[in-house]
Amino acid sequence: MSRSRTNGNFIDKTFSIVANILLQIIPTTSGEKEAFTYYRDGMSAQSEGNYAEALQNYYEAMRLEMDPYDRSYILYNIGLIHTSNGEHTKALEYYFRALERNPFLPQAFNNMAVICHYRGEQAVREGDSEIAEAWFDQAAEYWKQAIALTPGNYIEAHNWLKITRRFE
């Protein structure tokens, strides 16, 4: 039985029902349907905190999915898992790969900025202000890109940019 059929989460069940209806209505190849099934099961596992299972599903979805736009969301979700696991270098790599395929993912820019800001704070704690400033500058660039894509979102980032005089 597919993982998504056993999930007790109402939102996931609703998403699965709608997704299954769309897969029946919209003309898609069997490979596209299979890729989406793996993606959907990956999201279900990820929402339950089963990251290893989610990654397996996402990697299988990546093997089958050919559309760059759809691949960008798979890569983004893989980045989220690496972020949650504290694997920031890997997370940045996957966010970057997602943005190569879809440059209109403000959430990827935001997550990259958060990681850079975190690394900047680590450098401050270690007494390396030069490295900290470089990380903060990089965070600022990513937040500017996220804000440019979705004006009105990322209010805290916008305020940080103003306070630190990094907003142009």
UniProtKB/Swiss-Prot annotation:
Belongs to the Ycf3 family. Signal peptide: none annotated. InterPro entries: PSI_Ycf3_assembly (IPR022818), TPR-like_helical_dom_sf (IPR011990), TPR_rpt (IPR019734), Ycf3/AcsC/BcsC/TPR_MFPF (IPR051685). TPR repeats lie at residues 35-68, 72-105, 120-153. Essential for the assembly of the photosystem I (PSI) complex. May act as a chaperone-like factor to guide the assembly of the PSI subunits. It is found in: Plastid, Chloroplast thylakoid membrane. It comes from Plantago lanceolata (English plantain). PANTHER family: CELLULOSE SYNTHASE OPERON PROTEIN C, TPR REPEAT-CONTAINING PROTEIN MJ0263. This is Photosystem I assembly protein Ycf3. GO terms for biological process: photosynthesis. It is a peripheral membrane protein. SUPFAM superfamilies: TPR-like. Its main location: plastid. Keywords: Chloroplast, Membrane, Photosynthesis, Plastid, Repeat, Thylakoid, TPR repeat. Transmembrane segments: none annotated. The gene is ycf3. GO terms for cellular component: chloroplast thylakoid membrane. It holds the Pfam family TPR_1.
